[in-house]
């Protein structure tokens, strides 16, 4: 029997078992049950003394145990690390057992199962039937997984089954209550193993009149009285709420491969199961494949107070306790972990994921026709957009929400007619954002037409789950994660990096016959992070070349052989004499290149120096782990280039991405005290070496010159750690034309990247030169495993401060005719606590600055004068006209209790609001507010007690005739950001004092 592993899960009854859900080549699903064991590693001496004898035991052979406690010394008399070799045993017990002096107990039992039996969680195997005992049709027991799964075979494709769902609930206040608010709609996107896709929506007929029900039937809706009458081929079905819930129960109890929702763990599934029990007394029941265990659907929460989210709220995750092999997947929590977005509402995520440039085909009376295909945007974008459009009801044109009037869809494109004001441009960005509907009002005015409209919105949201599932490649990422992390598919996204690293680490330790132990308590001290340079200036009319180190921290660990067991010791000094003596003797006792000495910042205030010494003769655990990850990533990237099918490409892309993420997480885990890889000295040395590497690259580029086909680097090409046999001559021959004459200047850098200005505004030449620079830096400047990559040309770069800049980006693969990408890093455009007015204005002024830089007609003083004069005109005009809507000035904030002071004004604001409003603001909820003052207040220069002008804005708020927006608060914040874009501080201070009566705050460089 040839099978592919698709999920692993456990039963937690009196007799615990591990189950595999697998699929054969013919699409048949097969479950295999294994005994569940707890694993313990002991020495031969302890094994022989155990009473009663262990249930099962496997010899592990001789293994080396290394004590990895850090040795701290004030001199070079460092004791050798404790190390011993002994025969070890792996013990398997069906129940937990207290065994003294067991080691390697930090690893997961499931990882032990896979590794000890040589099984890959997502592998394909030809099973040996003699080790299988049939339990029932489609379920077998296996007591010897090692022999049963001995023959691994090449991967083969299999079909999967899915259920994507969404619900709508009646509500009359802010949020539906399961006790009083019925479910009005449930929509499903059902995909079976044959690939057949069914879309259907159930409508609660109890919310309609009998006349409306009859009209719905006349218009083609199916009306049913019981579960048995359900026809899944019909798109719209009317039934009672009880039947609606019974159908939900039947569907959720089926063994799909995936049941996918958006925030369904916290709401949809919980609401369905609670409503079902309330109305019928029934529960949703899952049964294990052997039919021996039944469990009720229950949502349980994990609160990780050690990982607090925004506003001090504990990181809470929600989980479904099923035992039938279905993976219940919540896209909301997945996207929260994998994407950094302004908002995690479904409409915001959709807008980010599904967009396409559309061409205006026709302009009518308050309607416009757009067409999208491979000629209007990058190949494939229109096809994806068209797929979402099949169920879409609204399309966002730039920021205007437009209702779909008509749509034509074909394989690689679409034509859509939108209810839209007349727009003048020829092309616009189309996206799927928020449907322009007010559900509260719809329920208030509820009738048949509204019910049918809501059915369309509901099925679109269910289908959006499918579209997002495919967009994020969740299935291939799940399989890739299972293989890489040595975890079941159902657990891949449930753990943090400190846990997922344990599988690969255990695998490596067993391969190298190594056990790492600690006898002392782990200590945590702060240490300096990556090097961030101060920007040399604010605005750049010349192009700036961006060079990034490839996987800097992983390669630092490999270069320095940084690992807890390769650390010889840490030498500290409390006075200058000690430091001088230690420095003189250090290189004699620990000469490079076998050893590397890393100067770090002292861990305690009474110390003046700290030097970590690492032995580079034998590769350590962390470097070996990283080398494996990077090699595997390179292998999958190569396979990705050679792949022919879309399935192969998706798998290989997910695999290379997974290895990239896990390799980059290792540095963080070295400094995380609860991690199995914790090594304070290694983490600290990693950032120290990283800083020296970025400083070294900056030193050779800052002041470099290109002329006559020769590149003169600014400094000798000397290894910053020790002398080697490389040629250090800074003059290097290039393959560039001899008439090229350019100078280079380093203007900024951050951790692993260097921003180098070239005295040219020609994009094509800049890219050509940068690619040659990349080649020369990698071949002549860098050494060992360090490499850099030319990432992009930044044109019209505007540096606000460290980590804050705006620019037009030309990627390394583009040219001057390419459309550049606008980049806003760390600026107000990407923040949620900034008003739309602020974002719109700052975008306008950055664009204007960018154009001025591009034209090059003005010096920095003229630019400053022109910008400030224009800004004053715009602000005065807005203040006098007061024409912009309140929506542009709304801000949002999360309500929480994480305030130092009990009488915090934010808390007071919400408390007072809740006293006077039936729709209260709950903990963890975001609310909108604005600064409002009396209408007769003149322009206020000095702003004091501005918190007292905060007003919560809800659906019912209307700005009174005796009120105005307190514009000055917003204007001051906007002006503060704009003056930080300009170079002339004197002019900026003068302008700010005249407008607001105080000096501006300039960002730290």
UniProtKB/Swiss-Prot annotation:
Coiled coil (residue ranges): none
Induction of the gene: Expressed in the early phase of the viral replicative cycle.
Annotated catalysed reactions: DNA(n) + a 2'-deoxyribonucleoside 5'-triphosphate = DNA(n+1) + diphosphate
Keywords: DNA recombination, DNA replication, DNA-binding, DNA-directed DNA polymerase, Early protein, Hydrolase, Multifunctional enzyme, Nucleotidyltransferase, Transferase, Viral DNA replication
InterPro entries named among the record's database cross-references: DNA-dir_DNA_pol_B, DNA-dir_DNA_pol_B_CS, DNA-dir_DNA_pol_B_exonuc, DNA-dir_DNA_pol_B_multi_dom, DNA-dir_DNA_pol_B_vir_insert, DNA/RNA_pol_sf, DNA_pol_palm_dom_sf, DNA_pol_type-B
Pfam families tied to this protein: DNA_pol_B, DNA_pol_B_3, DNA_pol_B_exo1, DNAP_B_exo_N
One Gene Ontology molecular-function label: nucleotide binding
Any one GO biological process: DNA recombination
EC number(s) stated in the UniProt entry for this protein: 2.7.7.7, 3.1.11.-
Disulfide bonds listed in the record: none
Record's function text: Catalyzes DNA synthesis. Acquires processivity by associating with a heterodimeric processivity factor comprised of the viral OPG148 and OPG116 proteins, thereby forming the DNA polymerase holoenzyme. Displays 3'- to 5' exonuclease activity. Might participate in viral DNA recombination. Does not perform OPG116/D4synthesis across an abasic site.
Family listed: Belongs to the DNA polymerase type-B family.
Subunit organization: Interacts with OPG148. Component of the Uracil-DNA glycosylase(UDG)-OPG148-polymerase complex; OPG148 and OPG116/UDG form a heterodimeric processivity factor that associates with OPG071 to form the processive polymerase holoenzyme.
Record's protein name: DNA polymerase
Native species: Variola virus (isolate Human/India/Ind3/1967) (VARV)
Name of the gene encoding the protein in the UniProt record: OPG071
